[in-house]
């Protein structure tokens, strides 16, 4: 199932939904001010989704100034609070999945003990939660995929998984997108799709940067990766990426039929 980020005006969102049938990944509850005005934001956004004709929803969780593995208990507690508020928004709006960043900053945080502390945070966060909403952890500035895979391995909860952002992997990491995929594929539940030329996080349409279409196609072939979000900031870029990704996905289905014959 394809989704696209709510980075357009609502009227443009409506047009894209009508043309493609895609769902929406909302950033509305990643913003602290909106979480501070939770009830008002929830009511307002629910109405906006209705006007857009959105029938399928994912949420992107908060991340600015937060750190799940902070040694400062106050910061950790605020992170837990903000994550919980976004989770409750997902529950109220019927979202099926919520994306959280690792919040890792290279050269500032050590990776020694990082996976253990992150797993401890999410075990606490997921305590007594069911699997009606999937939680996926997304790479951003992360340079290597192994620590994220270690976190997923340590968390024994059916709702937890990983989100591979191929654009972030392409520009912030020297490890290839293919290696990111191979390292994380056992735990992948979601995909963020956009392109760049490897120099900055430019969120270009698929096929206009340096990310291999064959790699994207290979990821789409994984049965557990049932959802992906197109993260571009213009209507034209979103539509170009959607039709490009759809073609890759349809090639997947053709290949599967040929294998069965």
Region annotations inferred by a language model:
Residues 1-6, 22-26, 57-60, 98-100, ...:
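Hydrophobic faces of well-ordered beta-strands that scaffold small-molecule active sites
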Residues 38-44, 75-83, 113-120, 149, ...:
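Charged helix-capping and loop-helix junction motifs
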Residues 7-9, 27-31, 62-64, 103-105, ...:
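Active-site beta-loop-alpha junctions enriched in small/polar residues
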Residues 12-21, 39-59, 85-94, 126-130, ...:
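Acidic (Asp/Glu)-rich catalytic clusters
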Residues 65-70, 105-111, 171-172, 198-204:
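A short acidic, helix-capping loop that chelates divalent metal ions and anchors anionic groups
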Residues 1-85, 146, 255-261:
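N-terminal pre-domain/capping segments
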Residues 15-16, 145-160, 170-261:
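Histidine-acidic metal/acid-base catalytic patches
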Residues 68-161:
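Active-site acidic/histidine proton-transfer and metal-coordination neighborhood
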């Amino acid at each position: 199932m394809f989704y696209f980020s709510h980075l357009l005006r609502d009227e443009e969102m409506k047009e894209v939904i009508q043309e493609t049938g895609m769902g929406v990944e909302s950033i509305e509850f990643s913003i602290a001010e909106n979480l501070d005005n939770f009830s008002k934001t929830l009511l307002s956004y629910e109405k906006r989704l209705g006007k857009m004709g959105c029938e399928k929803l994912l949420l992107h969780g908060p991340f600015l100034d937060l750190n799940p593995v902070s040694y400062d208990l106050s910061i950790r507690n605020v992170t837990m609070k903000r994550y919980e508020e976004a989770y409750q928004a997902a529950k109220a709006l019927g979202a099926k999945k919520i994306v959280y960043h690792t919040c890792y900053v290279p050269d500032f945080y050590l990776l020694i003990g990082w996976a253990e502390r992150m797993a401890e945070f999410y075990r606490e966060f997921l305590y007594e939660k069911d699997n009606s909403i999937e939680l996926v952890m997304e790479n951003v500035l992360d340079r290597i995929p192994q620590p994220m895979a270690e976190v997923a391995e340590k968390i024994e909860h059916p709702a937890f998984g990983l989100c591979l952002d191929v654009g972030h992997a392409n520009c912030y990491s020297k490890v290839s997108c293919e290696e990111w995929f191979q390292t994380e594929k056992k735990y992948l539940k979601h995909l963020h799709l956009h392109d760049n030329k490897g120099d900055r996080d430019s969120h270009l349409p698929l096929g206009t940067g340096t990310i291999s279409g064959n790699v994207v196609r290979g990821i789409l072939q994984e049965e557990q990766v049932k959802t992906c979000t197109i993260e571009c900031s213009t209507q034209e870029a979103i539509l170009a990426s959607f039709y490009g990704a759809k073609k890759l996905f349809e090639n997947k289905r053709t290949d599967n039929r040929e294998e069965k014959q």
